[in-house]
């Protein structure tokens, strides 16, 4: 868990049918459905705001998470470059960062990330939900194909960047049969560790997800939702931390056991240590008064 994060964008072009962040668009008076995917908000001021925060005398260093809400490497980043500018600020200050993404555009920033990783300042998590390209196209319509994301894991790992494969989300009765195969593919690509999160359906996500499920997989819809209710005490979602992320009950325990067994066998059960915070610095700027002591 992280106590601080930034998001260079609100909304996400990836259009994942299951995205738990969709309700955040409702706070802006926009729909969590199509608006979330098409009416995007870029934050070009983010790098300057970040630099100002890091220069504050009140600031205390801790790993900064990027991508915990919306993907910083969605297609819009290719033209805007806000994420890269944020990384440049973090590199200049030698500040630790952990990134979560499905976007292969992160390869563009390997030059910065490899330099930071060599100092123990950067780590990446790449989410692979399924290895089935057809299912991925339906469920994550504008996300790079699973094989392409695995290639990104390989390139990051080869550059010395500690990378975790994230099976996120696990969809009951739809993607759960692939759990071991996804982990094996991640290990083969060079992932250093692995994690998983169960499908979450907060607020407006639930009706959007159910509509998608009925359209694309009507024969499995009842079973998918029954499994979710089984894990959440009869409800489709629980906001309690542990139940929200992993669920409870026999099925949730089975998924956890399968994951743990496969991760151990593949060497992905490592606990990654903390990133370094002792290298943090505030670079001098033109006009700063230099200390004589």
Q: Can you annotate each of these PLM segments?
A:
Residues 89-95, 151-163, 231-234, 258-269:
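A structural motif corresponding to the C-terminal end of an alpha-helix
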Residues 117-121, 162, 188-192:
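Glycine-enriched alpha-helix->loop->beta-strand junction motifs that scaffold or abut catalytic
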Residues 103-107, 171-180:
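Active-site glycine- and acidic-residue-rich loops that bind
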Residues 177-293:
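Auxiliary Fe-S-binding modules of radical SAM enzymes
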Residues 1-10, 14-125, 129-137, 146-158:
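Conserved Radical SAM active-site core
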Residues 114-116, 142, 184:
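Short, solvent-exposed amphipathic alpha-helical segments in soluble enzyme
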